[in-house]
Amino acid sequence: MDIFGIPIQAFLGQLLLGLVNGSFYAMLSLGLAVIFGLLGIVNFAHGALYMIGAYVAWIGLDRFGMNYWVALIAAPLVVGALGVAIERSLLRHLYRIDPIYGLLLTFGLALIAEGIFRYYFGVSGESYPVPELLQRATNLGFMVLPNYRAWVVFASLVVCLGTWFLIERTRLGAYLRAG
């Protein structure tokens, strides 16, 4: 059986890989949306902060022998602290003036961060060991899905639903929405 001239197995496999990639994009865009919604800043440094988080996790794993799950918790905490420091020291002064200044500042910060990381780590990516729990794969009949890819979808669902719950169903969320 074919869908659009593509064998069903290949179509479902590509659909599932699209879901995995879309899960990464969902988490990235969620951060952008929350920052813009709360601060009114278009954060061009968001991708650079994502990169910094990836390198924090990699450095923890590779250089300090940190457990994968500990690095997974440590990376967003470090990036969150960096984001708070940027907001308190730089962005806070720009709220009452033209939004273009916040955009230019975050764009400049992104260029600086990317330049620093390119200088110290180069332009190729770094590999890291996949934890034993995620090294296996699941046979779905139409494809074999590595567990680490299923983990991405699961983690994205937890993060997105957790953020929705926090913003829509808690007092903190009501406070944040009231702005």
Walk through the language-model features, giving the residues of each:
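Small-residue-rich transmembrane alpha-helical segments that form helix-helix packing/gating elements
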Residues: 1-39, 45-179
